[in-house]
């Protein structure tokens, strides 16, 4: 049986990997000295993003052939902006990428 990965646009929601989700949850809220409420963030993310495994996302990224955009951050941005933009991963070609030249 052949297994074909759907294009990002065919997902019902944008996707995010568990490692990126953890990084977002550990990020401090902008202009605040307190940590963001993890439960509230998880509820929002569950409504707008689908958590998928790293290998599934990596395979889909290889098929889209947008490697020149930078290093994939583990999140798509077809409908919802990148949650990882707070950690330097803006949206390019429906995927959140980090500039490989930035430190």
Swiss-Prot record:
It comes from Viola biflora. It comes from the Eukaryota. InterPro entries: Cyclotide, Cyclotide_bracelet_CS, Cyclotide_sf. There is a cross-link at residues 70-99 (Cyclopeptide (Gly-Asn)). Keywords: Disulfide bond, Knottin, Plant defense, Signal. This is a cyclic peptide. This is Cyclotide vibi-K. The keyword Magnesium does not apply. The lineage of its organism: Eukaryota, Viridiplantae, Streptophyta, Embryophyta, Tracheophyta. Belongs to the cyclotide family. Bracelet subfamily. Disulfide bonds join 73-89, 77-91, 82-96.
